[in-house]
């Protein structure tokens, strides 16, 4: 963030042909974009979303309404262009990349797929560590690699998406661990489990959290209770942060990955924009911890990066605010 550019952009904002604060929160977004890009008139072009996919051993606890094979089936759907994220990305001028870091089963070669499978799904986090520290490191590097590709191919703003049956359980455990919250605050219904499924999710998260001990680093915590795609998402955002890009958050699992990235690099928070507020109850706690206001509140609970991609045109519009004429430039009298 460039404080001098922020001040210059604020001065220009106060002179634009509109009443003060008439564009509300979008004005703050515009100022942040200007400071991030180091220019008073920010420009946002094509976006990119990297959908990180992996399976979860914790599905053995009965925490999901869908069977594990849906993860692989949905990845194939992404590659064929048939998912919600594909359709929203077409509308939002956003490229879609898919990253396999732990899907059970083989996937075909595809130009939009980066195969970096660390292992075929995590171990059951309710019974023991989800992965080894070395596996967590590999997942992190895979996310970084996918982000580098997206940036090299022209992304000017970057989002992550997620796919993994059982991943709201892992996201809840990771969020609770990183923010010091009880399971009840962060465990939601995910894909739509009933009361018994919700109880099992809370128990699984509680058992995972009980194994943690003081002094563990963020990546150690993620290896114990997280998911391969959640760690990869942290890598995606870390790489985007180091490249200086605006970073758009999706829902609960993606924001869990972003929390991990933030714990590893606190300066990353200045680059984050909350695309939306998810239906998952833990998402509000995540955004509050990051100090972020969501751009959209549409009762979404799909994942895939959909909420982040829906917000991209809004971010582009916010950037254009500072391209408006000032009262002096337009020859308009001030009130």
From Swiss-Prot:
Keyword Glycosyltransferase: yes
Any GO BP: cobalamin biosynthetic process
Gene Ontology molecular function, alphabetical: nicotinate-nucleotide-dimethylbenzimidazole phosphoribosyltransferase activity
Active site annotation, chain numbering: 304 (proton acceptor)
Keywords: Cobalamin biosynthesis, Glycosyltransferase, Plasmid, Transferase
Pathway membership: Nucleoside biosynthesis; alpha-ribazole biosynthesis; alpha-ribazole from 5,6-dimethylbenzimidazole: step 1/2
NCBIfam families: cobT_DBIPRT, PRK00105.1
Family in the record: Belongs to the CobT family.
Protein name from the UniProt record: Nicotinate-nucleotide--dimethylbenzimidazole phosphoribosyltransferase
Source organism per UniProt: Thermus thermophilus (strain ATCC 27634 / DSM 579 / HB8)
């Amino acid at each position: 963030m460039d404080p001098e550019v922020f001040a210059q952009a604020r001065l220009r904002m106060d002179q634009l042909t509109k009443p003060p604060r008439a564009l509300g929160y979008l004005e703050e977004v515009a100022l942040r974009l200007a400071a991030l890009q180091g220019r008073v008139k920010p420009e946002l072009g094509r976006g990119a979303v990297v959908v990180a996919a992996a399976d979860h051993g914790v599905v053995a606890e009965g925490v999901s309404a869908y069977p594990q094979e849906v993860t692989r089936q949905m990845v194939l759907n992404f590659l064929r262009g048939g998912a919600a994220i594909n359709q929203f990305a077409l509308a939002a001028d956003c490229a879609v990349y898919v990253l396999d870091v732990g899907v059970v089963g083989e996937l075909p070669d595809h130009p939009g797929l980066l195969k970096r499978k660390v292992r075929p799904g995590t171990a059951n986090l309710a019974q023991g560590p989800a992965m080894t520290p070395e596996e967590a490191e590999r997942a992190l590097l895979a996310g970084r690699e996918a982000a580098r590709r997206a940036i090299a191919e022209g992304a000017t703003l970057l989002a992550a998406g997620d796919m993994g049956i059982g991943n709201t359980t892992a996201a809840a455990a990771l969020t609770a661990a990183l923010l010091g919250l009880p399971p009840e605050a962060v465990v939601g219904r995910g894909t739509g489990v009933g009361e018994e499924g919700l109880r099992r999710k809370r128990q699984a998260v509680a058992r995972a959290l009980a194994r943690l001990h003081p002094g563990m680093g963020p990546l150690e915590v993620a290896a114990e209770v997280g998911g391969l795609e959640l760690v990869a998402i942290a890598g995606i955002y870390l790489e985007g942060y180091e490249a200086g890009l605006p970073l758009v958050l999706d829902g609960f699992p993606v924001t869990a990955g972003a929390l991990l990235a933030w714990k590893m690099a606190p300066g990353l928070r200045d680059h984050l924009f909350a695309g939306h507020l998810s239906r998952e109850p833990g998402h509000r706690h995540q955004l509050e911890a990051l100090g972020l206001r969501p751009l959209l509140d549409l009762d979404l609970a799909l994942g895939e990066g959909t909420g982040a991609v829906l917000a991209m045109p809004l971010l582009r519009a916010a950037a254009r605010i500072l391209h408006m004429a000032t009262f002096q430039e337009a020859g308009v009298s001030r009130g």
